[in-house]
């Protein structure tokens, strides 16, 4: 993780000095690749340092960190750019990244064993692990790829991401074209879901750890159905009903925020082998963003394919979009139910 953050910080500094578009694009891509080292490293650390009954609380707060980081970036970097110019935006981000790499290197330790502590999630009579258990990482990672429960969770998360990015990408347009909201009002309503999403993600682990004894399946079902209900309120009630749409976005944001934590990684980490939790997150993450990408294509095709011109005005029929978005949320719940009793291998 230190390596990824350090290289990303150095690339940001280089971007500030770049004058070539091709070099800028190459550095941007390399930066993204090194940034991808962060999530898996964090999840591995969480799985090694915290027990099953407390991991969810920390995982939930960690899951919200990228949203908080983005918000701070928009504020801090935008302020730097407005005063000093765009190059200094990269310089500022690079310096913060270097500081972060130093902090991670100093305080982020590989495992309890590396600091002389006994491993967590190991029976009391077995506080030491055999060499084969601690070194056969490749076998454990291959096992993740063949675990049906991980694959089903990946599908569930992919369908959840379809409904998530449907609202994020098309929600403002939908409110304008279908319900007649102004751009400002539509943007405000959709922004409610983003704020509530952060709250839902931050407290998702606390909910499962404190209220359900570390079980994720029950709250995943509750908030999955909450997501379905929110989309039905948002899509199936015609006309301008500001407070109803606002309530729908509150429910949607809270539901998606919790599901991002559970379906988007935590449930897979819980059932994956301890030394392959990063691989489990990777499988779910890839499937999730494939779903998000397909959503943009499918939604665009369905919206454009059911557009008509009446008296020189573009009119959209969102019937099929409604089915697609709500259906995806329902399928996400359906697949999550398939792994109701899944246990760690």
Which positions does each model-derived feature cover?
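Structural signature of the two symmetry-related core transmembrane helices
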Residues: 1-13, 218-233
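Helix-breaking motifs and short loop linkers at transmembrane-helix boundaries and internal kinks
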Residues: 11, 17-22, 180, 237-239
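Cytoplasmic helix-loop-helix junction between adjacent transmembrane helices
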Residues: 27-68
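Helix-loop-helix hairpin linking two adjacent transmembrane segments in secondary transporters
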Residues: 62-113
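A membrane-interface helix-boundary motif in multi-pass transporters
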Residues: 82-94, 215-218, 301-329
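Juxtamembrane intracellular "pre-TM" segments in multi-pass secondary transporters
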Residues: 115-152, 178
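Extracytoplasmic gate region of multi-pass secondary transporters
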Residues: 147-204, 260, 295-299
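Helix-to-loop junctions at the C-terminal end of transmembrane segments
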Residues: 202-214, 303
